[in-house]
């Protein structure tokens, strides 16, 4: 069997960023024919062809992703820059507030009291001059000192000239500050007299006079100014000011004009500088009033110690530290650990909820229950994949994986346990030998599959029973005249055996599709072809019954060509041959084509390693135990080997071929029956020979537990919505069934068929199914759950029949699947409540009315059609309108009461509780008849 590395087409399309039609069109132009479906598997060679052509599309997709990532990075960087700017602005605001807090110190210092000593203050001022230039915001502290120094007129003009040359606007800033400082100083020191104020005005006049002289002089005067010079000239200026009052008036006039200019400018400066700057904010506060300005600053601004303490506490909170001691720290750590653990558990639970742990062949309804979605969503997902499924149809592993991916779920199968625990041994190419091909015979029911195998076995003159088993897969080994061996698998053709056909296609190397020449390409034939194509095995068509007069092989080939399956006769690649399984015509040539196909496949296997293969069937043989029919695919199986098969394990005690002959060992491509398993494995399970018995038991136990968990998850509990639906329906019933069969494949087929019979009014529940005879425990379970026991090719064992009679449990046994399905369908129809259908029995015309006291109105009538019955209901019709509906209280002919009156006779009748009867009215008699309901599928 060829199991090449393949890739799904939809993954390749997403990788190269191309459409399905584009890929299929390009591959067709290159000579590669593939199905135009997203789920089609493509080989590595086709992948390379697509990669060479569409690598540019892939690179464009990658480039677009990179561009998108770069844009994301740019947005993130821009966001960080904005965040940093915002933080920087906040820090500047904090610095501004802190600087305003520091300015309060110089404002409250009482240096104005030192005006009595102008000489000492001038020396201090000269030493502090460099610092004042660095900090312009401290100018209010300089101004009172300058006002007191009346004996230094030449020094200050020199300094102001320098400022005027460098920054002309600084002078305008400094002058308003002199006036603003006065109200602040007056409020800070209440003991001040009015005399210093007059001196300050005089000092301002002298400074203004100095400024007028500066304007006339050049910048050269700044170079000649010395610190020692102003000490001598300051005294003379004071004397001249006192002697010349005329000059004061002129200077005052100039000061008034300049004060007006300053006020105008100050208003403008306030409007501009309110936005920022410590000095401007300070000036605005002085304008409003020092009292209102100082209070919020003292309240808002903490001390340096408080700031540092707050910073330390914040850092400790961020670092998870605490100054409360080790106990609080330990409790906080425990809370954090518990919170983190809870978050991890929640994340793990969410991820686990997205993983479906299932076995293969789960029904659509079970998958919907596990994923908590509507069944219709699963069906629509399958339809998008080109599959028509029903809610009770089973999905194989491949389809289940694809459907789960559509709903963002992952699927884990039980076979993964073996793959994890059992290491695959690398095979030595020298040990590989040619093995016999495994051929599966598939087709529609009654098209001659088993008849073909019967003839093949009879042709080889091999003693034994004919393999006429049609209810499950039969495995046979055939040796031809030339010494070649072929292993045949016979699959059933009934629609209920979908899963068994799928397993047969997965195990096989070559598929023979049998089609009757006098019939058509039936649905099961199409299904078998699709299974073979999905498994990737070559197909050979055997057109059977070609010896019949009604046979038309060309019609079959035409239908196959319409399905895009061209046989060699019509120029295609698929082999076909006309045969007759009854006469044997063409069978030999068909086998030769099978051997030719096997040679092309170059089938090889290693007989020296531990055996592995597939379980074909399993059943319980009374007296011997569980027997499994298996097909060895690699290695050699021997008596005494410990085998793990699905959820069961055991040591092989005996091996037999299909005719009951004992076999010591079985090589590759050999079907045998083994005895020794502890249970009946499911058909399709893989088996492996294990070296360690304990390891095999552990894996089997894990699989059993997983299957039990899956059964619990897929068991639907009744909900309020379902209860409401049943109440609204009014007549809802359930049919519980316990199903026992001879082989696992037949049990599964019956389970699917029975569940498909469920309708809105009757729900079929398979509460238990198994392989083997009907036991007492089955009867007791049926008694407890009010169920019916159905046996397929099995009978009650021991006292089961007596217990069933005592408990009044119905046991039905069948040997043909059609009979079981039809009987169950009839039973379900019998459970349905009959429908009431109205039937009109006759009509009568009122010719005359008679009114009798104490009785009422009597109608004299003539029956015009049908029969009027005494027990029937009646309608009184007047002018084509129903006036009253009721029943008769009496029906008489002449004076005698009668049960019925037929057409053409007259009679008298009285309508119960109604007397408004007139001549010409029509009385219509009717009665309700119960009609049997039929099943309506969902």
Swiss-Prot record:
Residue ranges, compositional bias (Basic residues): 260-270, 285-296, 323-333
Compartments, as annotated in UniProt: Cytoplasm
GO CC term, one of those recorded: cytoplasm
Keyword Cytoplasm part of the UniProt annotation: yes
Region (Disordered): 57-350
Region spans: G1: 443-450
Domain tr-type G, first and last residues per copy: 434-602
Gene3D superfamilies recorded: P-loop containing nucleotide triphosphate hydrolases, Translation factors, Translation initiation factor IF- 2, domain 3
Region (G5): 580-582
SUPFAM superfamilies linked to this entry: Initiation factor IF2/eIF5b, domain 3, P-loop containing nucleoside triphosphate hydrolases, Translation proteins
UniProt cross-references to PROSITE patterns, sorted A to Z: G_TR_2, IF2
Region feature (G2): 468-472
Region of interest: G3: 490-493
Pfam families in the cross-refs: EF-G_D2 (PF22042), GTP_EFTU (PF00009), IF-2 (PF11987), IF2_N (PF04760)
Superkingdom as given in the UniProt entry: Bacteria
Gene Ontology MF term list: GTP binding; GTPase activity; translation initiation factor activity
Acidic residues composition-biased segments: 206-215
Signal peptide: none
InterPro entries in alphabetical order: EF-G-like_DII, IF2_II, IF2_N, P-loop_NTPase, Small_GTP-bd, T_Tr_GTP-bd_dom, TF_IF2_bacterial-like, TIF_IF2
Residues noted as binding GTP in the record, renumbered to the chain: 443-450, 490-494, 544-547
Basic and acidic residues composition bias: residue spans: 57-205, 248-259, 297-319, 334-344
Keywords, alphabetical: Cytoplasm, GTP-binding, Initiation factor, Nucleotide-binding, Protein biosynthesis
UniProt record similarity statement: Belongs to the TRAFAC class translation factor GTPase superfamily. Classic translation factor GTPase family. IF-2 subfamily.
Job of this protein: One of the essential components for the initiation of protein synthesis. Protects formylmethionyl-tRNA from spontaneous hydrolysis and promotes its binding to the 30S ribosomal subunits. Also involved in the hydrolysis of GTP during the formation of the 70S ribosomal complex.
Name of the protein described by the UniProt record: Translation initiation factor IF-2
Protein source organism: Christiangramia forsetii (strain DSM 17595 / CGMCC 1.15422 / KT0803)
The gene coding this protein: infB
């Amino acid at each position: 069997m060829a199991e090449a590395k393949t890739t799904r087409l939809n993954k390749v399309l997403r990788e190269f960023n191309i459409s399905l039609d584009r890929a299929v069109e390009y591959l067709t132009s290159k000579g590669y024919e593939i199905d135009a479906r997203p789920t089609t598997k493509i080989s590595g060679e086709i992948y390379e062809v697509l990669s060479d052509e569409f690598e540019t599309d892939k690179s464009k997709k990658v480039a677009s992703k990179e561009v998108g990532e770069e844009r994301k990075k740019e947005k993130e960087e821009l966001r960080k820059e904005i965040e940093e700017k915002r933080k920087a602005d906040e820090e500047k605001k904090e610095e501004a507030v802190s600087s305003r807090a520091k300015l309060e110190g110089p404002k409250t210092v009482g240096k104005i009291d030192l005006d009595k000593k102008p000489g000492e203050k001038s020396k201090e001022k000269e030493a502090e001059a460099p610092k004042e230039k660095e900090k312009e915001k401290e100018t209010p502290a300089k101004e009172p000192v300058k006002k007191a120094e009346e004996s230094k007129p030449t020094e200050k003009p020199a300094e102001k000239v320098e400022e005027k040359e460098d920054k002309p606007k600084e002078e305008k800033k400094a002058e308003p500050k002199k006036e603003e400082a006065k109200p602040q100083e007056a409020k800070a020191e209440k003991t001040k007299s009015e005399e210093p104020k007059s001196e300050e005005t005089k000092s301002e006049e002298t400074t203004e006079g100095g400024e007028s002289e500066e304007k006339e002089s050049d910048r050269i005067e700044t170079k000649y100014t010395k610190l020692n010079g102003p000490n001598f000239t300051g005294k003379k200026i004071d004397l001249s000011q006192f002697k010349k009052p005329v000059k004061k008036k002129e200077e005052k006039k100039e000061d008034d004009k300049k004060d007006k200019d300053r006020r105008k400018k100050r208003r403008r400066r306030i409007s501009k500088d309110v936005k920022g700057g410590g000095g401007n904010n300070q000036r605005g506060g002085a304008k409003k009033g020092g009292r209102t300005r100082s209070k919020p600053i003292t309240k808002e601004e903490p001390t340096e110690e408080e700031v540092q303490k707050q910073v330390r506490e914040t850092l400790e909170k961020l670092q998870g530290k605490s100054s409360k001691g080790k106990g609080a720290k330990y409790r906080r750590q425990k809370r954090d650990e518990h919170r983190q653990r809870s978050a991890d558990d929640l994340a793990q639970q969410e991820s686990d909820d997205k993983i479906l742990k299932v076995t293969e062949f789960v029904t659509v309804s079970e998958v919907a229950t596990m994923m908590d979605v509507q069944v219709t969503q699963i069906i629509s997902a399958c339809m998008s994949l080109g599959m028509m499924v029903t809610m009770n149809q089973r999905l194989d592993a491949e389809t289940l994986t694809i459907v789960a991916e559509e709903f963002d779920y992952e699927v884990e199968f039980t076979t993964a346990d073996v793959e994890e625990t059992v290491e695959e041994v690398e095979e030595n190419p020298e040990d590989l030998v040619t093995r016999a091909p495994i051929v599966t015979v598939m087709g529609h029911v009654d098209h001659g599959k088993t008849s073909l195998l019967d003839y093949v076995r009879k042709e080889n003159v091999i003693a034994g029973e004919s393999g006429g088993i049609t209810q499950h897969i039969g495995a046979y080994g055939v040796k031809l005249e030339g010494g070649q061996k072929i292993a045949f698998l016979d699959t059933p053709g009934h629609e209920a055996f979908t899963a068994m056909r799928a397993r047969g296609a997965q195990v096989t190397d070559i598929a023979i599709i049998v089609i009757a020449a006098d019939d058509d390409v039936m649905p099961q034939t199409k299904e078998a072809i699709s299974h073979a194509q999905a498994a990737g095995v070559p197909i050979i068509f055997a057109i059977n019954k070609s010896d019949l007069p009604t046979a038309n092989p060309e019609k079959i080939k035409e239908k196959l060509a319409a399905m895009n399956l061209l046989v060699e006769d019509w120029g295609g690649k698929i082999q076909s041959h006309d045969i007759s399984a009854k006469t044997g015509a063409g069978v030999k040539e068909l086998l030769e084509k099978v051997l030719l196909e096997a040679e092309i496949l170059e089938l090889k296997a290693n007989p020296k390693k531990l055996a592995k293969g597939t379980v074909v069937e399993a059943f319980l043989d009374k007296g011997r135990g569980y027997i499994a029919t298996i097909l060895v695919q690699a290695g050699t199986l021997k008596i005494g080997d410990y085998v793990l098969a699905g959820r069961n394990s055991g040591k092989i005690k005996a091996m037999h071929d299909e005719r009951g002959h004992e076999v010591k060992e079985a090589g590759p491509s050999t079907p045998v029956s083994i005895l020794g398993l502890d249970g009946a494995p499911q058909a399709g399970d893989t088996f492996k020979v294990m070296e360690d018995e304990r390891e095999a038991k552990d894996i089997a136990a894990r699989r059993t537990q997983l299957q039990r968990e899956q059964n619990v998850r897929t068991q639907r509990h009744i909900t309020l919505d379902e209860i409401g639906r049943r109440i609204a329906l009014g007549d809802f019933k359930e049919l519980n069934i316990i199903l026992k069969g001879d082989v696992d494949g037949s049990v599964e087929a019956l389970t699917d068929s029975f569940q498909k019979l469920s309708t809105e009014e009757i729900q079929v529940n398979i509460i238990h199914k198994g392989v083997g005879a009907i036991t007492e425990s089955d009867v007791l379970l049926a008694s407890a759950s009010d169920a019916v026991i159905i046996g397929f090719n099995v009978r009650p064992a021991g006292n089961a029949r007596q217990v069933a009679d005592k408990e009044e449990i119905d046991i039905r046994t069948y040997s043909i699947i059609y009979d079981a399905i039809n009987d169950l369908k009839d039973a379900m129809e019998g459970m349905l409540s009959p429908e009431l259908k109205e039937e009109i029995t006759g009509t009568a015309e009122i010719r005359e009315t008679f009114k009798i006291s104490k009785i009422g109105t009597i109608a004299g009538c003539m029956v015009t059609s049908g029969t009027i019955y005494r027990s029937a209901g009646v309608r009184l019709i007047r002018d084509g309108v129903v006036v009253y509906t009721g029943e008769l209280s009496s029906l008489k002919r002449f004076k005698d009461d009668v049960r019925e009156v037929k057409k053409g006779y007259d009679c008298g009748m009285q309508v119960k509780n109604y007397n408004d009867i007139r001549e010409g009215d029509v009385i219509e008699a009717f009665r309700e008849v119960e009609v049997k309901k039929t099943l309506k599928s969902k």
